[in-house]
Every structure is written in structure tokens, then in C-alpha cells.
């Protein structure tokens, strides 16, 4: 016997379904559900009087030890927002990995069951929630361990960078120099609440200077102008990278002392490289570094300080830059060095290039001009700003922004994972990957997550007073949970190293307890592999006016005076926020 209910009632009970559109936070972005993999009338739902009970939605006979389809955790009826699509499904997690996405339940009484809920299964209600892959920040200065918690609080679960603490070299460059420092930082990573990967310092005129750092456990190399971004340094770093299958990140020569951007492109020679803060305010060939975004072998990223372009960007940047790069405001040459990097024309063009898909990755440059806890928030602020200024993307409409949403979520999930050689492990919601997942209430999307899973275990989330009678009593704050307690912290987190270090037992050599995994398939990556962000238009920058043209057309935008996901979320009692969430059929 069938029973019909309204879409509003259905959304209240089981969450939105196919054809419904959800507003993301207080932005003007709407995610339309493309498909629903659960079965109407057979939805799995936990609670008193609900169906996930013994002999009903929960199998009374299937054993975990005998049947690999029996999961450890089911997330029910979640809206998955990923580069693979925007859809609704149950998520099945076993041994810390996503083993099934579809319809979970009891195959004895339910049709079309993709994975089994048994007596061994925990339930997490995803009805009305959005689930995304944990964010990946590829531009992190390891200045203080506290950055990891700021990252988690905005949904970032993997950080890649370098440093040794608040040394001047680390304040400036994201590299950990030498085998001893790399080993110490690998040991330090044992206590971190996020996945980590370390970049060695590129330099020297022979391969061995960088090779010994890759062999010591660095997962990548970093070329930075403050240590010398000479053409020889770039060439030798890439030689090492090709030999060991690792990435090279490039902060190029702002002063053009050893060559211009064309010379750097020539020294790269068609090899894969990751270009940091490609607009140039964070550093790199002035004023025309953005030309590299035209090349298929160069993976261009942005950093959060200049995204989105607002009325406060320019005055904030000069002082930040002076501090981060150890410059002296009393020395005129240092001031001119800083001034050369802050150009409103290229900053304005950066927003548009991001929206076009010509810039592939978003990152933070944390504590060295950027804020690690704002990567995800600023990505969605930028997407909102671009929709308001440029209109819907091709194929989108007023209440359907799926193409733009897939473009922007790819910038901090799957694309950095591909660029750094870790996409087999993290970066998307796909079967076989580790369950590093972020759960959001739609009204809070992009600003403050509800809960964060690391390798399938609840690690961080909003929790009430621990002496209260229920878990939702004020004050409700983000807190560490059992996934980050005791030895579980090591078990649910990953340290990424070079394949050489992995095969030569770096884990055993250093006595590491974390899940140590090798990076691979890096050197064959091109910009065409960047999901929804693979455009390679011809980009030119006028050396006198700094105007930016794309395929001969001037591109720019106005600075924003007001942004979503801002003070409403940071200085308001969150329980009193009332943001309209749309669950309606879009025809």
C-alpha cells in the first residue's frame, strides 16, 4: 500500500530529495539534488519508533566477520556535495573507509540494498545535512601546531606544507629543510589532529641536496624566492621530483632578479609543477605571474588573502607582507618590494579567473598572509560574489548552481589531492577512500561544520556542556571528540611521505604510529586532470597598467563591500540564526 506526503513533509522526515534545491548558508548559491539513491518507503532512519531496529531496517542475522557488506557506520539520507555529483544517499563506512554509497539497510526485507546495517553498525542521522569531503590545504606554514585546530573548525582535514615552528625561514617559506628537521616534524605530526605532508626545501646545484630530503620522508619539494628561486634551482628540483615521483611547489621570483616569468616557464620545460598564489600578491614574478595559468603543465593555485576581492584587501596586505617576509619598513627598497606585489588589477582579475576555472586550487598561506580557518569559507564567499557579479554559469540558473558548486568544491578537495598524489586516499566521497567527511547544517554551510569524521570516526564537532543532561545544552562549541582521544588520534590520521621513504620503512625507522602512506602518480598530472578547473586561456598582463586580458578581452571585477558567511556567523548567537533553506521543486 502506497502513501503520499508533501515534499515539505518528506524533507522534514527524510531530508530533501531529487529536484529539491538547497540554499548554502546565507549565500545566493543553490544546490539542486540530481538523484536520490535511497528507496522511497524503505528509507533507513534511526530513532524511537523508526525503522533501524532489529529485524526491520537492521539485519538480525548478518555478521560483520562473515559479510564484508556489513558496515561499522551508516550515515543515513545525507545530501552529498562533491565533484562526483550533488545527490542523496546513505553512506556505509567500514574499517575507516567508504565501502558503499547508495541504499543501506536489511536485505531480508528491503529491496535494492547496497550495504547492510547489522548489530555491529552505528548510525549517524544525515537527514537534512550536507556531507562533503574534508578540505585539503596545500599551502601551510608549520608555525604552530594550533593551526590544525583552526583548520578543522572550518572543515579542513589535510594540511600540506613545511616548516619547523616560528623560525624566520618557516614564517616565510613552507619548507622543512634537511633530513633531521624532516624527521623531527614527522615525529611531531604524531600528535596532530589532521593528515599531514611535509615539503622539503629545494636548493643547490646538484640533485643530492634535494634527493636526501625526499628520501628522509618529504612528500614534495618547495622552491621559494626567499631561499632562492633561480632557474637552476627550479630545474634541479624538478629533476629530483621526476626521479622520485613527487610534486614541486613554486613561489617564484618577485623581483625578476634571475629571470622573468617567460624564463621560469622555459626552465620548467613542460614538466609538472604547482604554482603557489598565482595572482602574485603572495609572491612571484611581478606583475605578470598569472601568465602561468595558461600552461597545461602548471597547476595554478590561489591563496585566501586575496579571495574574494573586497574593499579591505589592499590596505590589509602591505603590513602583512612586511611581517611575513622579514622586510623593514625603514628601508625604501623593502617597501618598494612589498608595493610591487599588491596590484588591484591582478587581484580583481583573480576572482574572475577562479570563476572561469582557470585557477585550479584554493589554499591558505596560513600565518604568512593567509588564514587557515577561512579556506572553505572564502571559497564560497567568492562563488557567491561571482554569481552576483557575473550571473549563473552556463547550464545553471537562479536556483540551480550545481556547475559553479562543483567547480568551487573541487578547488579545495579533489584537485589538491590529485596535484599532490594523494587522491587515492582522500579528496572526494568515493568508495575505497578514507572516510574523512564533514557534516554541515545547510544554514551553516561553508562557515561552521556540525561534525567532522576522520577515517570514519567522529573526531571533532559541535558539543554542548559536558555536565548537561542532553548533548545540545549551551554553551555549544567545537570540541575534540573520541576520534582524537588516546591512540585513536594516530589511527585515524595519515602522514604522507615519498614512495622511496615508504618503501624504505620510514615508519619503522622513526617509530611512527600514524597511518603512513606514499604519494604517487604525481609527475604525469596536468591541468587537464583538474576537475571543473582545467581552462588554459591566453592570459596577458600589461606591464605598465597591470590590466589583465584573457583571450584578448579585459577582465576585472568590483571589490565587494559585503559578504555572506561573515559577521552573522561570527558574532551572533548561532541558535538564533534563522536562514531560509529552500526545499522546493525547481521546474
From Swiss-Prot:
Record-linked InterPro entries: Amidohydro-rel, Metal-dep_hydrolase_composite, Metal_Hydrolase, Urease_alpha_N_dom, Urease_alpha_subunit, Urease_AS, Urease_asu, Urease_asu_c
Associated pathway: Nitrogen metabolism; urea degradation; CO(2) and NH(3) from urea (urease route): step 1/1
Subcellular location: Cytoplasm
Residues the record lists as binding Ni(2+) 1: 139, 141, 222, 365
GO CC annotation, single: cytoplasm
Cofactor(s) required for function per UniProt: Ni cation
GO biological process, one term: urea catabolic process
Binding-site residues for Ni(2+) 2, renumbered to this chain: 222, 251, 277
Protein's UniProt keywords contain Transferase: no
Positions that bind substrate: 224
Main location: cytoplasm
Domain spans labelled Urease: 134-572
Cofactor annotation comment: Binds 2 nickel ions per subunit.
Modification after translation: Carboxylation allows a single lysine to coordinate two nickel ions.
Catalytic-site annotation from UniProt: 325
Residues found modified as N6-carboxylysine: 222
Keywords annotated in UniProt: Cytoplasm, Hydrolase, Metal-binding, Nickel, Plasmid
Stored Gene3D superfamilies: Metal-dependent hydrolases, Urease, subunit C, domain 1
EC number, UniProt record: 3.5.1.5
Example of a GO MF term: urease activity
Any Pfam family: Urease_alpha
Annotated catalysed reactions: urea + 2 H2O + H(+) = hydrogencarbonate + 2 NH4(+)
Family classification: Belongs to the metallo-dependent hydrolases superfamily. Urease alpha subunit family.
PANTHER family, per database record: UREASE
Subunit structure: Heterotrimer of UreA (gamma), UreB (beta) and UreC (alpha) subunits. Three heterotrimers associate to form the active enzyme.
Protein name, entry field: Urease subunit alpha
